[in-house]
């Protein structure tokens, strides 16, 4: 006679299935045009990913670029040429439809921001999925650290810097950073918390004076939305997965598709699985 499965194991299995379902539902909502906005704090517990899609002819160089720049470009997955599925990241993923908003680039110029890219898909396209700081924000919130853009219901502010990335083939350009204002004591705690997640950018690359990294005005981000910086707070900057978009603008490949900043692929992976310690 088979012994019944203990309740705690059933509960654990149901929790895992429920969590996976939240990521899948977010993708279905994007696929159906019901999710078109930023994904910060969406499907809590789930890994979110930045996207860059390039022709196979330059994919090898871009792979090396990511390997040489793991802070802004921590790779989570790479697709096979022409294959829009990414089974290692989740059930039934179609990278052509499951991101809330895309950007289309031709010769380095942004030409469109569609909700799906099925009509642009080619057999030679390779998708790169890159870790996103939205994943470590869950850990920040759990540790009582404020995340201002979530509080204000807007997109995270992102800025191009004067910090150069390490080139690979034709790919080179400035590092892009995301910014979250924190009190000094909270900034120290944020360093400790985010250091546990190197596959989603890890610890900050700079805190304090933005001019030292080439940012002239925090009120005018290059991507995303400006947020309030309150008395006693300092800006804290993390390497950002939008860096490939600044590189695309500089390198001007003949064709490229990216996510719109802040509009991520929500995966079935759990943030807890990415913690290094």
Swiss-Prot record:
EC number: 4.2.1.-
HAMAP family named among the record's database cross-references: Hydro_lyase (MF_01830)
Any matching Pfam family: D-Glu_cyclase
Protein's UniProt name: Putative hydro-lyase BPP3031
Top-level class of the enzyme under EC nomenclature: lyase
GO MF entry, a single one: lyase activity
Species annotation: Bordetella parapertussis (strain 12822 / ATCC BAA-587 / NCTC 13253)
Keywords: Lyase
Lineage: Bacteria, Pseudomonadati, Pseudomonadota, Betaproteobacteria, Burkholderiales
Gene3D superfamilies referenced in this protein's UniProt entry, alphabetically: PSTPO5379-like, PSTPO5379-like domain
Keyword Amino-acid biosynthesis: no
